[in-house]
């Protein structure tokens, strides 16, 4: 029977017991944790500043009170709003001995009351540290915090959280707690469902944000892993490429076809193998092979190759010839000594123009004439026949206007420089018949056999070198020509631009002005 009564009492007490949640707020150094310890009866317990959140459970009558002790620092006040949806009431602690912070405390409490979850919830205000001489009374605290305009149920209780040693806990602490619990009890039927609903909404919102945050972190982690994998694959490809091509011939040479395949053979006939190493000379490869590969690659690549010159190259100087110029200035007339100091050449017989006469060979350079190859015949041009005869003008005494009577050492259509100036008729005729000295002209345009001299036209460098006939057959003049030619600048119409001499030096035919002939080795001076 006694056991049944005990169980019935416990059942009734459990049914009437209610749970409420209270948030303990206030600025830093206001005494929040000390006040909570005093309510619990732990007066002598040392406290430290609260950084974050502490939870404590109290029993008051039929209520089980859960207290959230939140830190009051500036960096911690931002987290207060996360707990306001779960509380039924608030305990706000003010340092009454520090009136200078009333304004800061007022702004902080106003931000809390403006939160949507604090609507119509009671507030218990403790004006702490009343034992200090600078402590403000409750009326000044109400004025300093601006509680006159507060719409929430509120009440101010001056108190001293930390009593001197040997004294009991300040009863005003218990009075303020009883007032708050009684106010919540009167509104419990309205507050509790609202607190449960708002707390659930906040938990769901927090869960949703947490899930989004985790999803965002997961995507970022996957993106980092993907980028890391791509970088590793790219690094492996580069490493593989380096292993395949580092020190090896390029893959384009392995094809072996087209221009590149043909050019890969090299210049000296050295074939480049596909696996042949390309290294500088002295490092596992000889210099000629590397040079051949370089030239082969250069030929295989697209290049713009200029077309060769239109004029045939000048004859190469024979090895046994004199190292000076092959074209030397000589006296063009009879009885005049040659440039080398030998006897005079004399006049060319008239029969030589017809191909039957053999001119006398000079005794100065017989080995040069014997070493030169015969001049190949060239095709005649229509503009050469019978034109240069009337245009030839000689400055030598006794010179004729006909090309057949011209000195053998002077090309037709050119004026020699040793005689007087030609007259107007000779100059006009020369302008009509003279051509470019570099244009190829036939040697037989004036008629005659292989040894005849062409008239009225310029001559190729080979013709000026060899004279008018073949050397081996003994035909033509053996004299070295003194080409005092007038170069045509308008397509061969004979506009005189000045005199120059053709000097063959270092395998090249170079036009030299008369005043510069003294500086050329082997070229005599007119003076």
From Swiss-Prot:
NCBIfam families: small_GTP (TIGR00231). Keywords: Cell membrane, Cell projection, Cilium, GTP-binding, Membrane, Nucleotide-binding. GO terms for cellular component: ciliary membrane. SMART domains: ARF (SM00177), SAR (SM00178). Contains an incomplete active site due to the presence of a Gly residue in position 72 instead of a Gln, probably explaining the inability to hydrolyze GTP. PANTHER family: ADP-RIBOSYLATION FACTOR-LIKE PROTEIN 13B (PTHR46090:SF2). Monomer. Cilium-specific protein required to control the microtubule-based, ciliary axoneme structure. May act by maintaining the association between IFT subcomplexes A and B. GTP binds at residues 26-33, 69-73, 128-131. Residues 381-444 have a biased composition (Low complexity). It is found in: Cell projection, Cilium membrane. SUPFAM superfamilies: P-loop containing nucleoside triphosphate hydrolases (SSF52540). The keyword Membrane applies. InterPro entries: Ciliary_GTPase, P-loop_NTPase, Small_GTP-bd, Small_GTPase_ARF/SAR. It comes from Chlamydomonas reinhardtii. Belongs to the small GTPase superfamily. Arf family. CDD domains: Arf_Arl (cd00878). It holds the Pfam family Arf. Residues 445-457 have a biased composition (Gly residues). Residues 200-248 have a biased composition (Basic and acidic residues). This is ADP-ribosylation factor-like protein 13B. GO terms for molecular function: GTP binding; GTPase activity. Residues 200-252, 300-503 are annotated as: Disordered. Its main location: membrane.
């Amino acid at each position: 029977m006694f056991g049944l009564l005990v169980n019935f009492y416990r059942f009734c007490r459990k049914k009437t017991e209610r749970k409420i949640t209270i948030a303990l707020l206030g600025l830093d150094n206001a005494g929040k944790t000390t006040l909570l310890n005093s309510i619990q009866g732990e007066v002598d317990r040392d406290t430290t500043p609260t950084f974050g959140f502490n939870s404590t459970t109290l029993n008051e009558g039929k209520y089980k009170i859960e207290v959230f002790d939140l830190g009051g620092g500036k960096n911690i006040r931002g987290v207060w709003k996360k707990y306001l949806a779960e509380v039924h009431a608030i305990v706000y602690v003010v340092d009454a001995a520090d009136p200078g912070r009333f304004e800061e405390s007022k702004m902080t409490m106003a931000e809390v009351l403006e939160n949507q979850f604090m609507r119509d919830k009671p507030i218990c205000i403790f004006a702490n540290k009343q034992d200090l001489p600078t402590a403000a009374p409750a009326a000044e605290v109400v004025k300093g915090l601006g509680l006159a305009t507060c719409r929430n149920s509120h009440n101010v209780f001056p108190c001293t959280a930390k009593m001197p040693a040997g004294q009991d806990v300040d009863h005003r602490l218990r009075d303020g707690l009883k007032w708050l619990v009684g106010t919540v009890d009167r509104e419990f039927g309205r507050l509790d469902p609202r607190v449960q609903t708002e707390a659930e909404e906040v938990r769901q919102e927090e869960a949703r944000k947490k899930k989004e945050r985790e999803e965002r972190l997961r995507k970022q982690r996957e993106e980092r892993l993907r980028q890391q994998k791509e970088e590793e694959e790219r690094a492996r490809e580069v490493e593989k490429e380096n292993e395949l091509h580092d020190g090896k011939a390029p893959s384009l040479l392995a094809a072996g076809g087209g221009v590149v395949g043909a050019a890969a053979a090299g210049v000296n006939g050295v074939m480049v193998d596909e696996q042949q190493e390309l290294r500088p000379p002295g490092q596992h490869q000889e210099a000629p092979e590397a040079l051949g590969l370089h030239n082969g690659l250069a030929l295989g690549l697209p290049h713009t190759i200029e077309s060769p010159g239109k004029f045939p190259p000048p004859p190469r100087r024979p090895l046994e010839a004199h190292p000076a110029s092959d074209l030397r200035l000589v006296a063009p007339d009879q009885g005049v000594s040659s440039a080398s100091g030998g006897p005079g050449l004399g006049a060319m017989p008239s029969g030589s123009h017809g191909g039957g006469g053999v001119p006398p060979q000079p005794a100065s350079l017989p080995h040069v004439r014997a070493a030169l190859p015969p001049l190949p015949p060239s095709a005649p041009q229509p503009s050469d026949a019978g034109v240069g005869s009337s245009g030839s003008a000689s400055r030598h005494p006794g010179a004729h206007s006909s090309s057949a009577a011209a000195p053998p050492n002077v090309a037709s259509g050119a004026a020699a420089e040793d005689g007087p100036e030609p007259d107007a008729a000779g100059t006009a005729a020369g302008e009509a018949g003279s051509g470019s000295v570099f244009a190829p002209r036939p040697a037989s345009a004036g008629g005659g056999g292989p040894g005849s001299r062409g008239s009225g036209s310029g001559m190729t460098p080979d013709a000026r070198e060899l004279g008018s006939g073949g050397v081996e057959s003994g035909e033509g003049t053996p004299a070295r020509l003194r080409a005092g030619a007038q170069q045509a600048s308008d397509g061969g119409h004979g506009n005189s631009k000045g005199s120059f001499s053709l000097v063959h030096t270092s395998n090249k035919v170079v036009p030299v002005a008369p005043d510069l002939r003294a500086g050329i080795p082997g070229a005599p001076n007119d003076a």
